[in-house]
Amino acid sequence: MTKNIHKHRILILDFGSQYTQLVARRVREIGVYCELWAWDVTEDQIREFNPSGIILSGGPESTTEHDSPRAPDYVFTAGVPVLGVCYGMQTMAMQLGGKVEGSNQREFGYAQVEIKTDSALIRDIKDAINPAGEAVLDVWMSHGDKVTAIPSDFVTVASTDTCPFAIMANEEKRFYGVQFHPEVTHTKQGQRLLERFVLDICACEALWTPATIIEDAIVRLREQIGEDHVILGLSGGVDSSVTAMLLHRAIGKRLTCVFVDNGLLRLNEADQVLEMFGDKFGLNIVHVAAEDRFLAALAGVDEPEAKRKIIGRVFVELFDEEACKQEQVKWLAQGTIYPDVIESAASATGKAHVIKSHHNVGGLPKEMKLGLVEPLKELFKDEVRKIGLELGLPYDMLYRHPFPGPGLGVRVLGEVKKEYCDLLRRADAIFIEELHKADLYNKVSQAFTVFLPVRSVGVMGDGRKYDWVVSLRAVETIDFMTAHWAHLPYDFLGRVSNRIINEVNGISRVVYDISGKPPATIEWE
């Protein structure tokens, strides 16, 4: 009998911080299940979730404003430990009788926190000892407001030169507030602090591991599906690949994978997917060669969002056609992951703006009479990759750079043509090959080539040529929300440029994109 890996769970209430998902990922890394909910959750919902502890996230609002978000009152009467982070500490302090004020001295970045009082939260956790003999923590601050008076039943645990209450605690109730961000790597002991809260103070057992997640998923899939058949759109990307492997382990040949070759994939990608999943792992795969259909639908279209929607629509049409041929199929599997669920919830409540539409989220027709199977919907991307390794998928496939759902359809600027895609595929393959050879591939977060629909004069031998331009793009980022262009060596860029121009007939010029995000996005379209 498998252990209940959801037995011990942490509830994280989201007040809008850019780091909130990182808090959840850190808790999962500790080995404990957690969920991320909006701050205005009801008492009944919290009772039903039955958390072992609650974390209040940071956020951009000011608790000094009358309409700023507040934690539900039940959070402080539920009888479980509570950790407030940054804004979470401020709202905890204010709601329990303390004071918060705006400050002329804002703290953004590195700070040293001096420990004044012993606390279960940080006992024996320190980075150094200062001349006064106090333990010191190196932390990351990001706040304007600050607590100026703590609730009467709290004590001051730590402070900085400009923040008198950097950590506060009520040990009896197991309520703690930290003005810094323990979830970011700049807070050196942040993970130890979170481990102390989750494992010791909340008394959670670390049951959330790749092996137990797989075991639990297989049991639940078999219970949900029974003896029925399942269909899955297999793209060769991380999410659909891990979904396929989980389902294959759970139900074997009752899974049918539909692989749509849209003509917008990377060089030799279709052959690689079919060889790996069909020949090596023995999955049942239906190969749909649909390059002509996609390119016909994209003819004459140059607006990026229109291209995305067309690619999504044609994929759904093809998938629907194949699903109708599979008379035994009762379930549709999707590689939805936890950030998709969070994003969809935010969109449903009007708290998010669509910057680029996702071609594979919520796109399948409502009239399809199939049940939905989403075995990854509780997992973050890093967890999906770890599970993939456990299931036997190769590291290089799981950890390769992100590739957009519409594929080369949004890396060929303007109208998409077969000629452009063929040239781009070959140029991009050279760039990626050289990154691997120079041991640079894993030192950048994402790298790819973009086809520009403009011609440029070049000289080859004694003749002139008038051919196409491509741009190389490489970025470094932690979360893909912001990114810096990668400072690749000039000799490396020169080598890539020479190879592309000499080996790809039809390209006469190679440029390098040095735009950051913001103001640019990582992808060009």
Swiss-Prot record:
Q: Which residues form the Glutamine amidotransferase type-1 domain?
A: 9-207
Q: Which residues bind ATP?
A: S235, G236, G237, V238, D239, S240, S241
Q: Which residues form the active site?
A: C86, H181, E183
**What Gene3D superfamilies does this protein's entry cite?**
3.30.300.10, 3.40.50.880, HUPs
Annotated catalysed reactions: XMP + L-glutamine + ATP + H2O = GMP + L-glutamate + AMP + diphosphate + 2 H(+)
| GMPS ATP-PPase domain: residues covered | 208-400
Q: Which GO terms describe its molecular function?
A: ATP binding; GMP synthase activity
Question: Which keywords does this Swiss-Prot/TrEMBL entry list?
Answer: ATP-binding, Glutamine amidotransferase, GMP biosynthesis, Ligase, Nucleotide-binding, Purine biosynthesis
Top enzyme class, one word, equals ligase
Q: Which Pfam families match?
A: GATase (PF00117), GMP_synt_C (PF00958), NAD_synthase (PF02540)
GO cellular component terms, A-Z: cytosol
Q: Which E.C. number(s) belong to this protein?
A: 6.3.5.2
Q: In which pathway does it act?
A: Purine metabolism; GMP biosynthesis; GMP from XMP (L-Gln route): step 1/1
Source superkingdom: Bacteria
InterPro entries with a match to the protein in the record: Class_I_gatase-like, GATASE, GMP_synth_C, GMP_synth_GATase, GMP_synthase, GMPS_ATP_PPase_dom, NAD/GMP_synthase, Rossmann-like_a/b/a_fold
Tell me the PANTHER family matching this sequence. GMP SYNTHASE [GLUTAMINE-HYDROLYZING], GMP SYNTHASE-RELATED
What this protein is reported to do is described as: Catalyzes the synthesis of GMP from XMP.
Q: What is this protein called?
A: GMP synthase [glutamine-hydrolyzing]
Record the organism.
Yersinia enterocolitica serotype O:8 / biotype 1B (strain NCTC 13174 / 8081)
Q: What is the lineage of its organism?
A: Bacteria, Pseudomonadati, Pseudomonadota, Gammaproteobacteria, Enterobacterales
